[in-house]
Swiss-Prot record:
Keyword Coiled coil attached: no
Any one GO molecular-function label of the UniProt entry: L-ribulose-phosphate 4-epimerase activity
Cofactor remark from the record: Binds 1 zinc ion per subunit.
GO cellular component: cytosol
Keywords from the UniProt entry: Carbohydrate metabolism, Isomerase, Metal-binding, Zinc
Record protein name field: Putative L-ribulose-5-phosphate 4-epimerase UlaF
Pfam families xrefs: Aldolase_II
Reactions mediated catalytically: L-ribulose 5-phosphate = D-xylulose 5-phosphate
């Protein structure tokens, strides 16, 4: 697990490097599906002092199997998503400014241009709000459930992120670094959408044929973007 712990540590350290977190407001995890174990950031540990050996290993029920710290308070959310979507290899949660602003506004981040379409096939959805009962109960688990309720049976890697109403963004990917990459892009397109709608409040969504082209040339069966 040492290699995965190092990867998760590096991915967590990318969050402040890319300006996605303030203080300790964020976490990254990754899963070893063969072993059924998840590595995640420890709760409340400052990035400035954090080391790879501080990462916490939990099983799929959330039981700590390795580590001296408590795991992130959002661990149950991560585990619920890993259980539901086998294509996920890494998950990120932040409170990055612009994506969180859309979450607080209760609005999906609209697909307005090709930058968005290169990564997200359509709007980045916003969940419904959690009920008082859901919040007072197993809050973090129910956060995962409301994300799943919103995504349904869609392939999560086609829209690798979501904003949870009144909370903030979650992003995911094939591994921890891919998840962070998608979180960075989500914050950037959230900022772009806010600026674009400020300039032109009547702005429509990107044309569907242009969105399809940009997404499929990177992610479709006949993708040709980048090097083989």
């Amino acid at each position: 697990m040492q290699k995965l712990k190092q990867q998760v540590f590096e991915a967590n350290m990318d969050l402040p490097r890319y300006g996605l977190v303030t203080f300790t407001w964020g976490n990254v995890s990754a899963i070893d599906r063969e072993r059924g174990l998840v590595v995640i950031k420890p709760s409340g540990v400052a990035y400035e002092t954090m080391k790879a050996d501080d990462m916490v290993v939990v099983d799929m029920s959330g039981k700590v199997v390795e580590g001296k710290y408590r795991p992130s308070s959002d661990t149950a959310t991560h585990l619920e998503l890993y259980r539901r979507y086998p294509s996920l290899g890494g998950i990120v949660h932040t409170h990055s400014t612009h994506a969180t602003a859309w979450a607080q506004a209760g609005l999906a981040i609209p697909a307005l241009g090709t930058t968005h379409a290169d990564y997200f096939f359509g709007d980045i959805p916003c969940t419904r709000g959690l009920s008082e009962e859901e919040v007072q109960g197993e809050y973090e688990l129910n956060t995962g459930k409301v994300i799943i309720e919103t995504l349904g049976d869609a392939e999560p890697l086609h829209t690798p992120g979501i904003v949870v109403y009144q909370h903030g963004p979650f992003a995911w990917g094939k591994d921890a670094h891919d998840a962070v990459h998608n979180a960075v892009v989500m914050e950037e397109v959230a900022k772009m959408a806010w600026i674009a709608r400020s300039i032109n409040p009547q702005l429509n969504h990107i044309d569907s044929f242009l969105m399809n082209k940009h997404f499929m040339r990177k992610h479709g069966p006949n993708a040709y973007y980048g090097q083989k």
